[in-house]
């Protein structure tokens, strides 16, 4: 595994995305559209500074952060909530904790070979996404 997450990543699989969205109280119609979409992630990393773009035909979401620095995040690309977000390194894995209305919310992201792995968590729901480097 490596800490380098730079690149353009295309989604290969998206397991339990609907369960994750239900845990976030996302409406039925939006969930039905979102589960059918393929996402592309564009990550620009300079040390601990990240600029991330998640693009699909339905919605795009940009997230810029510095590892170890808590910030206010508006999750407008997903459920429209305001959360306090902190991203840290655990070995070569980015670990994000999002404090707010929903319990046990956050994500883990890491690279192995030409694959980017992302686990999204809310409550007892875990969505596992795999992306391949383009």
Curated annotation (Swiss-Prot):
Cross-referenced Pfam families: Lipocalin
* GN (gene name): Rbp2
- Role: Intracellular transport of retinol.
Q: Name any GO cellular component annotation.
A: cytosol
Key words, A-Z: Cytoplasm, Retinol-binding, Transport, Vitamin A
MF GO annotations: binding; enzyme-substrate adaptor activity; lipid binding; molecular carrier activity; retinal binding; retinoid binding; retinol binding
Tissue occurrence: Expressed in prenatal liver, intestine and lung, and in adult intestine.
Native organism is Mus musculus
Q: What is known of its domains?
A: Forms a beta-barrel structure that accommodates hydrophobic ligands in its interior.
One GO biological process term is: retinoid metabolic process
Q: What is this protein called?
A: Retinol-binding protein 2
Q: Which PROSITE patterns match?
A: FABP
Q: Matching PANTHER family, A to Z?
A: FATTY ACID BINDING PROTEIN
Q: InterPro entries, alphabetically?
A: Calycin, Fatty_acid-bd, ILBP, Lipocln_cytosolic_FA-bd_dom
Residues binding all-trans-retinol are 41, 109
User: Record's family?
Assistant: Belongs to the calycin superfamily. Fatty-acid binding protein (FABP) family.
Where does the record say this protein resides? Cytoplasm
Q: Which residues form a coiled coil?
A: none
